[in-house]
């Protein structure tokens, strides 16, 4: 500890140095020490604020432009794990690669086993992030939801797709309802060729299925399996590419016109620009949920998902729509309203 400022050295030498000189040096050291204390405290507070105000402290991407790059944040370490929606797994994986490049002491890994499984897993604490096409309120109990924090990272359009040999290129919501309830079974009933419709559905628990059925059936209960129930969006891609006379549904990022055709709904093309104002009715917000007590690595990765590094470019590159581009919002009940 430095000597007390009030102390006056006698006018003698100490170790060959005049007492007056020692006092002057003490004052200079004291001032330098105070400056170091101040700067250290300021940097510490800035670091705490930077970590505390983002990550699992709020929801939505509206503050993304103000967050900057998580890659520039203070170095973090740890393991981030996720499960959930396969629809935007590619986006999460692409973002994870960039994040790990900038933060080599963090590993980010996971699976796309469906929104329901992802939400159940994050609520149980078996993963640190649950990815979902639907609000947690639609899949979990209220006491589970209250312990989670939602981060809305993108919006995705979803639409019906048909085999290459199918001549139908536009269906109404009423026609889709008939097909996916088993009431319409032949393509000629909707203006196509005389051929039996092969319905490829997603398994129960899929957020893509929940979003599609909510748009087509509203509040009506549906329990129609179709000819097959598939686990993931990638499985639908594969099956649609090898099956004639089939119909299914996929998010826009999984459209592949070399394997199947995406068709209009009510005369509206499945385009991102038509989703932003709700002209195209089948769409969902992509959610990433974490625990309120999430670790720093998870918080930092979610901050990165909302940063300009992801929202400014990567979201659209991966076939999604930035939340900031939307002119409307959709709540947990499915109600759409203007921003």
Stretches found by the model and what they are:
Residues 14, 22, 36, 61-64, ...:
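Serine/proline-rich low-complexity intrinsically disordered segments, especially terminal tails, linkers
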């Amino acid at each position: 500890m430095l000597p007390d400022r009030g102390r006056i050295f006698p006018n003698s030498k100490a170790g060959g140095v005049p007492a007056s000189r020692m006092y002057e040096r003490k004052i200079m050291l004291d001032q330098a020490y105070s400056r170091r204390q101040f700067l250290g405290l300021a940097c510490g507070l800035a670091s705490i604020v930077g970590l505390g105000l983002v990550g699992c402290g709020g929801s939505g991407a509206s503050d993304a432009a103000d967050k900057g790059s998580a890659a520039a944040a203070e170095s973090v370490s740890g393991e981030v794990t996720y499960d959930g929606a396969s629809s935007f797994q590619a986006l999460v994986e692409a973002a994870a690669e960039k994040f790990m490049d900038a933060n080599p002491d963090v590993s980010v890994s996971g699976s796309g086993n469906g929104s329901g499984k992802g939400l159940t897993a994050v609520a149980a604490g078996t993963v640190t992030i649950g990815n979902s096409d639907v609000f947690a309120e639609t899949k979990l109990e209220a006491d589970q939801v209250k312990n989670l924090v939602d981060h809305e990272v993108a919006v995705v359009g979803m639409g019906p797709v048909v085999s290459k040999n199918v001549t139908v290129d536009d269906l109404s919501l009423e026609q889709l309802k008939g097909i996916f309830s088993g009431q319409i079974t032949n393509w000629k009933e909707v203006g196509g060729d005389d051929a039996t419709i092969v319905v490829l559905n997603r398994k129960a628990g899929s957020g893509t299925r929940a979003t599609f059925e909510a748009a087509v059936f509203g509040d009506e209960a549906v329990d129609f399996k179709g000819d097959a129930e598939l686990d993931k969006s990638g499985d639908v891609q594969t099956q649609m590419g090898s099956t004639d006379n089939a119909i299914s549904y996929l998010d826009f990022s999984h459209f592949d016109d070399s394997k199947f055709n995406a068709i209009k709904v009510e005369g509206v093309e499945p385009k991102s620009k038509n989703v932003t104002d709700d002209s195209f009715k089948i769409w969902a917000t992509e959610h990433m949920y974490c625990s309120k007590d999430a670790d720093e690595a998870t918080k930092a990765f979610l901050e990165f998902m909302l940063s300009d590094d992801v929202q400014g470019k990567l979201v659209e590159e991966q076939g999604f729509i930035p939340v900031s581009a939307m002119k409307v919002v959709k709540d947990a009940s499915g109600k759409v309203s203007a921003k």
